[in-house]
């Protein structure tokens, strides 16, 4: 059975949210306040990290935030990076900041994450923010899960009592999005199943899902025979795969085999233009919360 699917258009929704944030910033300025300030720390010249950081800086401009970028070469020491984090923690003009991951092998990522002041941790990676999320307290929620849930909210996707299968158990997407959709209220109140590389019967589990969130990082893993008619599919995957027809030689591919899965869905996110833009705009909304003093 084929259904006519609708796109969960992250590009469109993120544009609407940017306008809402820009309006709040204008209000702040009219009342004599200052622009929210997001700082980013970038180590080395990883292509993906450069692209992400550039899109974050651009989004700051679009919503009227101040942004600053602190760059280090690959050979930066852990001590230097920790000192930078400490300076940003202490700087009253910086509302929130992010340290772009991955970091070089000689630096302990967890140590850096835990050095960030939870009140400025707009990436939502600090154990205190992760813990607050798990017990339903206000805190900074990691940007991708926050963006996914906001996308479901804006499209009025019913979640209460629905079976949601999350493919992937990463600390950045799989675990937090499961926590969010488990919480009381809409979007939330889901029955959650998390599948991962050791789950033996992923296909059977997926066939019972009303909502599937694919966050494995395996291109085109989810195929049509794994999806029941009318399901909602959210594709978090972003893998560059070789494509000789493209000028760059690559194309961005999700974890879902879009062309064959989409006709079975009620709603599905495209890649690109689905979850990606929602991630960036969620970072902006976290920064706005930080500037208002989420923890105060």
UniProtKB/Swiss-Prot annotation:
<dbReference type="InterPro" id="IPR046346">
    <property type="entry name" value="Aminoacid_DH-like_N_sf"/>
</dbReference>
<feature type="binding site">
    <location>
        <position position="238"/>
    </location>
    <ligand>
        <name>NADP(+)</name>
    </ligand>
</feature>
<feature type="binding site">
    <location>
        <position position="197"/>
    </location>
    <ligand>
        <name>NADP(+)</name>
    </ligand>
</feature>
<keyword id="KW-0658">Purine biosynthesis</keyword>
<dbReference type="InterPro" id="IPR020631">
    <property type="entry name" value="THF_DH/CycHdrlase_NAD-bd_dom"/>
</dbReference>
<keyword id="KW-0521">NADP</keyword>
<dbReference type="GO" id="GO:0009086">
    <property type="term" value="P:methionine biosynthetic process"/>
</dbReference>
<keyword id="KW-0554">One-carbon metabolism</keyword>
<dbReference type="Pfam" id="PF02882">
    <property type="entry name" value="THF_DHG_CYH_C"/>
</dbReference>
<comment type="pathway">
    <text>One-carbon metabolism; tetrahydrofolate interconversion.</text>
</comment>
<keyword id="KW-0378">Hydrolase</keyword>
<dbReference type="InterPro" id="IPR036291">
    <property type="entry name" value="NAD(P)-bd_dom_sf"/>
</dbReference>
<dbReference type="GO" id="GO:0005829">
    <property type="term" value="C:cytosol"/>
</dbReference>
<keyword id="KW-0368">Histidine biosynthesis</keyword>
<keyword id="KW-0511">Multifunctional enzyme</keyword>
<keyword id="KW-0560">Oxidoreductase</keyword>
<dbReference type="InterPro" id="IPR000672">
    <property type="entry name" value="THF_DH/CycHdrlase"/>
</dbReference>
<comment type="similarity">
    <text>Belongs to the tetrahydrofolate dehydrogenase/cyclohydrolase family.</text>
</comment>
<dbReference type="InterPro" id="IPR020867">
    <property type="entry name" value="THF_DH/CycHdrlase_CS"/>
</dbReference>
<protein>
    <recommendedName>
        <fullName>Bifunctional protein FolD</fullName>
        <ecNumber>1.5.1.5</ecNumber>
        <ecNumber>3.5.4.9</ecNumber>
    </recommendedName>
</protein>
<dbReference type="GO" id="GO:0004477">
    <property type="term" value="F:methenyltetrahydrofolate cyclohydrolase activity"/>
</dbReference>
<dbReference type="GO" id="GO:0035999">
    <property type="term" value="P:tetrahydrofolate interconversion"/>
</dbReference>
<dbReference type="Pfam" id="PF00763">
    <property type="entry name" value="THF_DHG_CYH"/>
</dbReference>
<dbReference type="GO" id="GO:0004488">
    <property type="term" value="F:methylenetetrahydrofolate dehydrogenase (NADP+) activity"/>
</dbReference>
<comment type="subunit">
    <text>Homodimer.</text>
</comment>
<dbReference type="GO" id="GO:0000105">
    <property type="term" value="P:L-histidine biosynthetic process"/>
</dbReference>
<comment type="function">
    <text>Catalyzes the oxidation of 5,10-methylenetetrahydrofolate to 5,10-methenyltetrahydrofolate and then the hydrolysis of 5,10-methenyltetrahydrofolate to 10-formyltetrahydrofolate.</text>
</comment>
<dbReference type="GO" id="GO:0006164">
    <property type="term" value="P:purine nucleotide biosynthetic process"/>
</dbReference>
<dbReference type="InterPro" id="IPR020630">
    <property type="entry name" value="THF_DH/CycHdrlase_cat_dom"/>
</dbReference>
<keyword id="KW-0486">Methionine biosynthesis</keyword>
<feature type="binding site">
    <location>
        <begin position="168"/>
        <end position="170"/>
    </location>
    <ligand>
        <name>NADP(+)</name>
    </ligand>
</feature>
<keyword id="KW-0028">Amino-acid biosynthesis</keyword>
């Amino acid at each position: 059975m084929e259904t006519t699917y609708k796109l969960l258009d992250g590009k469109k929704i993120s544009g609407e949210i940017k306008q809402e944030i820009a309006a709040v910033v204008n209000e702040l300025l009219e009342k004599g306040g200052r622009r929210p300030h997001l700082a980013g720390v970038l180590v080395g010249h990883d292509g993906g990290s450069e692209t992400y950081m550039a899109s974050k800086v651009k989004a700051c401009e679009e919503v009227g935030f101040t942004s600053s970028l602190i760059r280090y070469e690959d050979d930066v020491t852990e001590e230097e990076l920790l000192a930078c984090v400490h300076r940003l923690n202490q700087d009253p003009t910086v509302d929130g900041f992010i340290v772009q991951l991955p970091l070089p092998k000689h630096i302990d990522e967890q140590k850096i994450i835990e050095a960030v002041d939870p009140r400025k941790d707009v990436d939502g990676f600090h154990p205190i923010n992760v813990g607050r999320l798990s017990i339903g307290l206000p805190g900074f929620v990691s940007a991708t899960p926050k963006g996914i849930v906001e996308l479901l909210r804006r499209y009025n996707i019913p979640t209460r009592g629905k079976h949601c299968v999350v493919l992937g158990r990463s600390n950045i997407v799989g675990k937090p999005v499961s926590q969010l959709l488990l919480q009381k209220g809409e979007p939330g109140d889901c029955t959650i199943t998390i599948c991962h590389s050791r789950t033996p019967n992923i296909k059977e589990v997926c066939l019972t899902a009303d909502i599937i969130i694919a966050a494995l990082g395996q291109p085109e893993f989810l195929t049509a025979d794994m999806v029941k008619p009318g399901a909602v599919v959210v594709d978090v995957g972003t893998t560059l795969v070789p494509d000789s027809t493209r000028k760059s030689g690559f194309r961005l591919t999700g974890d879902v085999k879009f062309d064959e899965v989409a006709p079975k869905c009620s709603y599905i996110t495209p890649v690109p233009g689905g979850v990606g833009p929602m991630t960036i705009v969620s970072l902006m909304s976290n920064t706005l919360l930080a500037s208002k003093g989420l923890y105060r």
